[in-house]
């Protein structure tokens, strides 16, 4: 078990502290009802946990300590290194690994994984008991998952097309939510606010209107929308 509190994620935060901050943002979104699907939430928590593990390599730590720039000759982007710490036996590994791998766009990630294996192994050598090999077969699966699904490829197997499409759509959600949580944690801002303020403000506004015009009230459409605040509504004029 790696003690992430020993490694810096940035000047003022350890990897453990930042990861906990990101996880807390995910929990906030879930608790406030912005994440409805339990499955998406569980995958997001895993992605939040692992997304910055790659920063514990010695070159990154040296760069943070010495405040130097990224060295393309001796470093690999941390998002690439991070996925080697994810156990491929966990549920929904491919979606979680893909979300972590592409949560930054610092390089051609798949090319790096295929063509810079020696440097990757060197940077992860100190953590040999905590990492998992990723072969070309898995790299190919990740490449297929991140790209748009070609329906023509599955015209003889619509069920497989349905499965692949669902998996890709779940990846889009998890990756997007990971971005939100990571950016919010890095900026040290609230990720979202409770959606409980608008009704009171509208009621107060109506009371002010009724002081001048006692018969004022909401029209039929407005009443409908107020009664369906938890639903997705499309209104056409």
Task: List each language-model region with its residue ranges.
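Walker A/P-loop
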Residues: 229-237
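Accessory nucleic-acid engagement/destabilization modules that flank
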Residues: 2-11, 15-205
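Dynamic helix-loop-helix/coil hinge segments at AAA+ ATPase domain boundaries and subdomain interfaces
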Residues: 13-15, 207-216
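Residues that form generic nucleotide/phosphate-binding pockets
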Residues: 85, 205-208, 224, 228
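Pre-Walker A adenine-sensing motif
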Residues: 216-230
């Amino acid at each position: 078990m790696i003690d992430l509190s020993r490694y810096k994620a940035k000047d003022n935060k350890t990897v453990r502290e930042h990861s906990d901050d990101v996880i807390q943002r995910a929990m906030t979104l879930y608790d406030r009802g912005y994440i409805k699907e339990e499955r998406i939430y569980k995958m997001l928590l895993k992605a939040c946990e692992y997304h910055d593990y790659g920063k514990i390599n010695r070159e990154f730590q040296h760069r943070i300590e010495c405040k130097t720039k990224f060295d393309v000759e001796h470093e690999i982007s941390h998002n690439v290194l991070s996925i080697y710490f994810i156990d491929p036996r966990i549920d929904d590994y491919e979606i979680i690994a893909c979300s972590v791998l592409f949560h930054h766009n610092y390089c051609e990630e798949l090319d790096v994984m295929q063509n810079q294996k020696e440097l990757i192994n060197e940077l992860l050598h100190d953590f040999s008991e905590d990492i998992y090999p990723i072969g070309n077969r898995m790299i190919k699966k990740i490449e297929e998952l991140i790209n748009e699904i070609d329906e023509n490829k599955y015209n003889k197997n619509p069920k497989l097309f349905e499965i692949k499409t669902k998996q890709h759509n779940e990846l889009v959600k998890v990756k997007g939510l990971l971005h939100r949580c990571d950016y919010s944690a890095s900026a040290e801002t609230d990720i979202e606010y409770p959606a409980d303020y608008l009704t009171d403000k509208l009621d107060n506004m109506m009371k002010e209107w009724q002081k001048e015009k006692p018969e004022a009230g909401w029209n039929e459409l407005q009443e409908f929308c107020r009664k369906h605040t938890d639903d997705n509504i499309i209104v056409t004029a």
